[in-house]
Amino acid sequence: MPRFLTLPEVAEILNVNVPQVRALVRSGELKGVQIGGRGMWRVEDVQLEAYIERAYEETEKRINAGAEVEG
């Protein structure tokens, strides 16, 4: 995996759409950086892995609290 990923690449990895990735970056849940003259957004691979790890932790907390596991 390259060190910096485009938003479409992140969307493909997470199996979501690009607007959802933009929303994650905008909210600060997923750290991104603007690089280059056109200000293209990139997400560093370690930031994506950290986001995924936090998602696992939050999911575990919800399951332990009795949340249903669906689809």
Per-range role (PLM):
Residues 15-42:
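Major-groove DNA-recognition helix of helix-turn-helix-type DNA-binding domains
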Residues 2-3, 24, 47:
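Residues at the start of alpha-helices and the adjacent loop-to-helix junctions
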Residues 8, 28, 45-46:
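Structural detector for helix-capping/boundary residues
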Residues 1-20, 54:
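Polyanion-binding surface elements
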Residues 9, 26, 68-70:
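Compositionally biased non-globular segments, especially hydrophobic aliphatic-rich helices
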